[in-house]
């Protein structure tokens, strides 16, 4: 922006606006009123709000309420904003009026300025760009639209990529038998493929959960205007608008079942955030498992070696840390924190309007973006390239006293516990101690205690005891 100014006027009077700014007086007042975080609403939200203005102009024209030439100018201007060509003209802080009115007027003023240039005569931000709308329905609508688009275009594809990488790795290491662990203590064996199948299924469930929210995310409050009654909007505006927006985006938007609910609550945003939190928790679990399996390399589990991406210490030469899993856990923590913010925001629907819309929008879109980006990083820079330390895995498995569990149906729990205790105390393989303490033939013990068979589950013998 230049250091020169022009004078703009609104209902409160005159004030200076940067000469080359596309916004007008109301945006400038918001810039001056909210020098709080320096963080504007994200590009995805501004793009969605521009699509709202574009669809509204088309709907109002079809309803014969808006001059066709004015509508065409607004349509083109809004399309430019939606494409990100004027992002620098949306400076308002996320911590602003709770309805997001400042940002709605920012969009109205910028689009009106651009449309005026296109048309060659004045296009009014309120009378034309905001026709049939209120901030109270446009901002909640933009939350739904921006979230629906970013989930569909960014997060779901990223999670599908992570799922596919996990599936490929699952096949690659599917026959590696390792010590299972419960409570971080040795347990019965599993294959590495079985372990990864659990991770993959977590991600698949995450995708399914996101898809399950879509019907409510696609239901829009646009048409409710100020308090849900639809004052100053054509009775058919909501339906026309939803159809135009569907045509613009390729998503099946529709008017919400109840505009009063759509304006006064943010239950769908809270629901979506909850599903994002579940995905964050899943990624946290996967990342922590990777960190444990990679720990060492000498004094830890050392079952796998993650790709060495960068030096890990400014003081300890040769140290390499699990940086991608660590980044993943931090993203998870942030998303969980954002969910708390969105939950509190959702509680702030007083009578006919929620008044924490901007922070809900910001937090929701940040969570979506972070999860999408870190899912790809985790897939490509950690899971796809890790190597298996077969020797370390086999050594630990051979000395795992919990393998005696497979003998329970044959010798009983008490006898098995005694064998496990002695094997652990003497540091001997369970098969060797079982041979000493039972009358089972060596061949039978080898069959019953074969880790490759134990991972198949089921009963391996019959006799006294069990449970």
Could you say what each language-model-derived stretch is?
Residues 1-467:
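Conserved, well-structured ligand/cofactor-binding cores
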